[in-house]
């Protein structure tokens, strides 16, 4: 099963991205999603190569946001696809059965389609408004997560669901009670001056009910 905490990278330059990702890894994060929008192919490739090496050093999983061909080119662990990106089944055909494919969802119907087409995990959101992403889908809130997770249970759909969108430390307990598997976060880690302490606190809450 996948780790419960995923860091979605931030930074407008290669240097910013590397620094932010390196700090997240060094502070205990073991799943990185590289998100480097509106960049040249060359810069995206340079960054991905560097981050792959870092993730290998820290024994962390490494997936790439939206760019399936880059993920294939550098042999990343997988890719995360948005609602307007390549279809999940097409991505599965290209990447093969072993790679991780995550899909963004805003509704129960989105999840149904993703799972049917071979998605490994769902990034469900947004939980609340966030400046990290443009063109947000409708805000879900706790009630939205509860309703969608209940529909999944009723329809016997079992796939790890990650909450995303403006999540803070105090949100984790009520979110986990809805039945999600974990969270995918950006700003809370990037902007923290005490990343090790924060990631430890996040993981303590995320894994609170896990029996080892």
Swiss-Prot record:
EC number: 2.5.1.3
A single MF term (Gene Ontology): magnesium ion binding
Residues that, per the record, bind Mg(2+): 66, 85
Protein name from the UniProt record: Thiamine-phosphate synthase
Binding, 4-amino-2-methyl-5-(diphosphooxymethyl)pyrimidine: 33-37, 65, 104, 133
Key words of the record: Magnesium, Metal-binding, Thiamine biosynthesis, Transferase
Family annotation (Pfam families): TMP-TENI (PF02581)
Any one biological process term the GO annotation gives: thiamine biosynthetic process
Residues reported to bind 2-[(2R,5Z)-2-carboxy-4-methylthiazol-5(2H)-ylidene]ethyl phosphate: 130-132, 166
Cofactor note: Binds 1 Mg(2+) ion per subunit.
A single cellular component GO annotation: cytoplasm
Function: Condenses 4-methyl-5-(beta-hydroxyethyl)thiazole monophosphate (THZ-P) and 2-methyl-4-amino-5-hydroxymethyl pyrimidine pyrophosphate (HMP-PP) to form thiamine monophosphate (TMP).
Pathway connected to this protein: Cofactor biosynthesis; thiamine diphosphate biosynthesis; thiamine phosphate from 4-amino-2-methyl-5-diphosphomethylpyrimidine and 4-methyl-5-(2-phosphoethyl)-thiazole: step 1/1
Cofactors: Mg(2+)
Similarity-based family: Belongs to the thiamine-phosphate synthase family.
Highest taxon in the source lineage: Bacteria
Catalytic activity of the protein: 2-[(2R,5Z)-2-carboxy-4-methylthiazol-5(2H)-ylidene]ethyl phosphate + 4-amino-2-methyl-5-(diphosphooxymethyl)pyrimidine + 2 H(+) = thiamine phosphate + CO2 + diphosphate; 2-(2-carboxy-4-methylthiazol-5-yl)ethyl phosphate + 4-amino-2-methyl-5-(diphosphooxymethyl)pyrimidine + 2 H(+) = thiamine phosphate + CO2 + diphosphate; 4-methyl-5-(2-phosphooxyethyl)-thiazole + 4-amino-2-methyl-5-(diphosphooxymethyl)pyrimidine + H(+) = thiamine phosphate + diphosphate
Taxonomic source organism: Flavobacterium johnsoniae (strain ATCC 17061 / DSM 2064 / JCM 8514 / BCRC 14874 / CCUG 350202 / NBRC 14942 / NCIMB 11054 / UW101)
């Amino acid at each position: 099963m996948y780790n419960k905490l995923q860091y979605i990278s931030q930074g407008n330059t290669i240097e910013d991205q590397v620094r932010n990702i390196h700090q997240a890894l060094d502070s205990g994060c073991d799943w990185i999603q590289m998100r480097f929008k509106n960049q040249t192919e060359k810069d995206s490739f340079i960054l991905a190569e560097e981050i792959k090496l870092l993730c290998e050093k820290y024994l962390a999983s490494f997936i790439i946001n939206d760019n399936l061909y880059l993920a294939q080119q550098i042999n990343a662990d997988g890719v995360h696809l948005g609602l307007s990106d390549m279809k999940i089944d097409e991505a599965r055909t290209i990447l093969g059965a072993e790679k991780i494919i995550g899909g963004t969802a805003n509704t129960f119907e989105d999840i149904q389609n993703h799972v049917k087409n071979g998605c490994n995990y769902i990034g469900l959101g947004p939980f609340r408004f966030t400046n990290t992403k443009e063109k947000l889908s409708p805000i879900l809130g706790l009630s939205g997560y509860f309703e969608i997770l209940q529909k999944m249970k009723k329809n016997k759909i079992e796939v790890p669901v990650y909450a995303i969108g403006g999540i803070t430390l105090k949100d984790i307990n009520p979110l986990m009670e809805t039945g999600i598997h974990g969270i995918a976060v950006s700003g809370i880690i990037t902007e923290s001056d005490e990343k090790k302490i924060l990631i430890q606190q996040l993981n303590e809450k995320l894994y609170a009910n896990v029996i080892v």
